[in-house]
């Protein structure tokens, strides 16, 4: 008889204090005009993304839908700086358009997030539709 071992999945929200997660989601909802449940999903994915990037030491790009989580956390600068320094020993800078957000990039990022044990909300990791010429996002309207 085979034994099935349930491995619990990690959640990004568990990387910060519950009170901070609430403040971040409330801000994200208000700043981006989102319903609370969507802001929670975005912040959860964003924190998992940041942990993946921090642990890898490599620059990664979030999806267009997850990017507001990074912006939200960075705007809470004291908490963000302390979190980065305590967890990774460095501040993680945000360089917009540091990497194209095409399908292959998002598959790479979500694969890395999953490899660390996080459950990925695939609906938030689509391809960005807004492109900055001359870059092409792969399947956006500018291509």
What do the PLM-derived regions correspond to, one by one?
Residues 1-143:
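Intrinsically disordered, low-complexity, repeat-rich regions
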């Amino acid at each position: 008889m085979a034994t099935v071992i349930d491995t619990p999945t990690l959640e990004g929200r568990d990387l910060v204090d519950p009170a901070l997660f609430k403040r971040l989601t409330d801000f994200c909802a208000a700043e981006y005009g989102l319903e609370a449940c969507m802001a929670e999903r975005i912040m959860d994915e964003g924190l998992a993304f940041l942990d993946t990037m921090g642990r890898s030491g490599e620059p990664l790009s979030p999806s267009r839908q997850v990017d507001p989580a990074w912006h939200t956390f960075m705007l809470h600068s004291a908490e963000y700086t302390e979190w980065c320094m305590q967890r990774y020993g460095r501040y993680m800078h945000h360089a917009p358009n540091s990497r194209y957000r095409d399908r292959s990039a998002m598959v790479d990022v979500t694969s890395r997030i999953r490899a660390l044990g996080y459950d990925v909300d695939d609906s938030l990791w689509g391809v960005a539709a807004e492109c900055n010429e001359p870059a092409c996002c792969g399947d956006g309207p500018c291509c």
